[in-house]
Structures are given as C-alpha cells and as structure tokens.
C-alpha cells in the first residue's frame, strides 16, 4: 500500500460516538463538505435546526466546514441522543485527522462522553421521582 492509499483507508475508518441510547458511526472524507445521516440530508433526518447545529458543532469549532464529507450511520434512541452521539463521533474523527485539535475539542467538552442516562422507575411510585398523591386523612 502506498502512503496516499494508507491515508485514505484510515480517513474512511468509522469512529463511534454515543449518547443516551444512541450510537453514531462517522466516516470523514476530505471533500466538498457534503453531509449525510443514514443516507439522508441532516435537516431532513434531524428535523430541527438546533439539533443539526449541535451535531456539526465540532466542524464549526475546528473551522473545517466545507473541508470534509461526513457520512454517518446513526441508530438507537431519539433525535436528541442521536445528535449528541453524532457530535461526539465527528469530534473524535477530527482529532484523529489532526491531533492538534485535541486541546480545542477538549476545552469545548466535545470529547467527553455525556454519562447521563434516564433514571429508572421505582416500585411504589408512578415514575423515577414522582410520588403518588399523599392523603393525610
């Protein structure tokens, strides 16, 4: 394998990001800046501007918009979780491309896994925290 073939092969190896119950696998390929999530346009898939902006925030921070094609495969959870998973996967992929971005991404908190999960429902009450109505008499 030549050096350019090796660089292309590593550039297309997917990186994973997770949030809540969602998982995103992202491939970054140097190109014109086209994006697809599960074969669809980001706005068509995520449906809200805020989720699209949050998902592609790492590209904005690194000033790399229009320099990479992003191909993402997302599964599990809801749209917010998928957007967060996509954000982390893109940040990890950018750091793999350019190690100098690690400090910048770290300061923005883009490389840290958000460990918050849904709290379980407890027995003897209707939800995780809510209690049944108390009657004194």
Each model region followed by its residue ranges:
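Structured, basic alpha/beta domains of bacterial-type, RNA-associated proteins
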Residues: 2-20, 24-75, 80-137
């Amino acid at each position: 394998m030549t050096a350019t073939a090796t660089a292309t092969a590593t550039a297309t190896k997917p990186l994973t990001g997770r949030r809540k119950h969602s998982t995103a696998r992202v491939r970054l390929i140097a190109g014109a800046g086209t994006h697809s999530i599960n074969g669809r346009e980001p706005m068509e898939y995520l449906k809200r501007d805020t989720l699209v902006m949050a998902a592609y925030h790492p590209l904005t921070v690194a000033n790399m918009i229009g320099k990479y094609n992003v191909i993402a495969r997302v599964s599990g959870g809801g749209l917010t979780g998928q957007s967060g998973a996509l954000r982390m996967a893109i940040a990890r992929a950018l750091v793999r491309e350019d190690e100098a971005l690690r400090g910048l991404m770290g300061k923005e908190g883009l490389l840290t896994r958000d460990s918050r999960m849904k709290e379980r429902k407890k027995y003897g009450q209707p939800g995780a925290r809510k209690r049944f109505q108390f009657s004194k008499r």
